[in-house]
Amino acid sequence: MKLWLEDDVCRGTFTPRTEHCGWTGVTHGGLLFTALDEVMANWLWLQDLRGFTARAEVRYRQQVPVGTELALEARLVERRRRLIRLQGRAWRAEDRVLVAESDASFMLGS
């Protein structure tokens, strides 16, 4: 997984491999959520903020065959004191079809 900050958006790429299967040839949904959580957490990290995932919801829209390159992004939705709400999205890199998205809240360290 490669991640970087660009114009206040954390972007990244990830290509699931065979060991990431939930069942033959299809990427496990838990791994897709992990990729979304990682890009959202890195939005914090790359801005020198430290915290943890306090709550998260995920919506899966498409199956992801193993070997499919994904484009990831995380954006700030709202900030209230120590609570930051982010939106994460994952698309197939080749055609920008949305495969999964997450809305999550992160609690900053004190």
Question: Model-predicted segments: where are they?
Answer:
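Non-catalytic linker/capping segments at the edges of enzyme domains
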Residues: 1-19
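Intrinsically disordered, low-complexity boundary segments flanking structured domains
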Residues: 1-2, 45, 93
